[in-house]
A protein has these predicted regions:
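Acidic, surface-exposed loops and disordered segments
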Residues: 1-232
């Protein structure tokens, strides 16, 4: 299966069933972490609020927002020159970029159209979630993190096979000072004690689920550009 990250609003007419979420859990292997999920209205509303607040903190924290905007590639020329980060393509993006309306600098300017639209874009995605799931580990060592990463891939491959769209939301799991209160809140909500050391449990991933049209593959560097040839 080809895994894709869905960065679009999900279909509001198609709920995600408990059977589907349970089937996702069954693909995990020992050591991948514990996967839990919610799809009821009350818990969905609570998690949407946490995610919206986390996104607001990121946008209102200059260093964090600057990092995101500088990793955004706008239009085919930028994407082809550096096929990584966050890609924005299509006729509308090209036109706004050419007109100077959508640029990395504008995305950093709270008074700009680009900043306002970026905020609305992510909030629409958050509000369209039909289920949320999270992956937690009992410790937070590098091994725990790597195993959880493998679990994440297994979850996404399984979701793809089921026709289910999945998108990670990492903002609430960031560890910079401005996010500290929300970091504690999301751990409290999920019943995982926020980590104080590598011995403590931690949320390793938070994801929204739903149904959407198939996503195109994200741009990637050719494999040969990432390989290092060892000296003979």
């Amino acid at each position: 299966s080809e895994r894709r990250t869905a960065r679009v609003p999900f279909n509001q007419a198609r709920p995600v069933s408990a059977e589907t979420m349970t089937a996702l859990d069954e693909v995990l292997r020992p050591g991948d972490g514990e996967f839990e999920w919610v799809h009821d209205a009350t818990n969905l509303a609570a998690l949407k609020e946490i995610c919206r607040n986390a996104w607001a903190v990121e946008m209102e924290t200059p260093a964090a927002m600057h990092e995101s905007s500088m990793l955004t590639r706008i239009g085919e020329d930028e994407i082809n020159a550096a096929p990584d980060g966050i890609s924005l393509s299509g006729p509308a993006m090209e036109a706004m970029s050419a007109a100077g309306v959508l640029t990395q600098a504008k995305m950093n300017d709270p008074s700009s159209f680009a900043y306002a639209e970026t905020r609305k874009f992510y909030n629409r995605n958050i509000d369209s979630a039909m289920a949320f799931g999270w992956l937690a580990t009992s410790g937070n060592s590098r091994t725990d993190q790597l195993r959880a990463g493998a679990g994440w891939v297994r979850l996404q491959l399984a979701a793809t096979r089921m026709g289910l769209a999945m998108q990670p939301f990492s903002q609430a799991l960031q560890e910079y000072p401005e996010m500290a209160e929300i970091f504690e809140e999301i751990h409290d909500f999920t019943g995982v004690r926020a980590p104080r050391s590598a011995l403590d449990g931690r949320l390793q991933g938070l994801f929204r689920f739903g149904y959407a049209r198939p996503s195109a593959p994200a741009p990637r560097w050719p494999l040969q550009t990432r390989l290092i040839v060892a000296d003979e």
